[in-house]
Amino acid sequence: MRNMVNKDQVAGLAKQLKGSVKQAAGKATGNRRTQAEGMADKVAGKVQKAYGDVKDKVKKAF
C-alpha cells in the first residue's frame, strides 16, 4: 500500500513553516505581535496536520 499524504497534512506543515519564519522574523525585529502571530500559525498548522493524520488513519482502516 502506498503512503499518500493528504492536503491537510501538507497544508498543516506549510502553516508550521510559515509560522516558524514569522516567529523568527518577529523575534529578530523585536516585534512581539509578529512573533505571537507566528506562534499562532505554528499551532494552527500542528492542529491541521494532526487532523490530516487522523483522516489518513481512518481512510487506511477502511
From Swiss-Prot:
Transmembrane segments: none annotated. SUPFAM superfamilies: Hypothetical protein YjbJ. Residues 1-42 are annotated as: Disordered. Belongs to the UPF0337 (CsbD) family. PANTHER family: UPF0337 PROTEIN YJBJ. This is UPF0337 protein mll8179. The lineage of its organism: Bacteria, Pseudomonadati, Pseudomonadota, Alphaproteobacteria, Hyphomicrobiales.
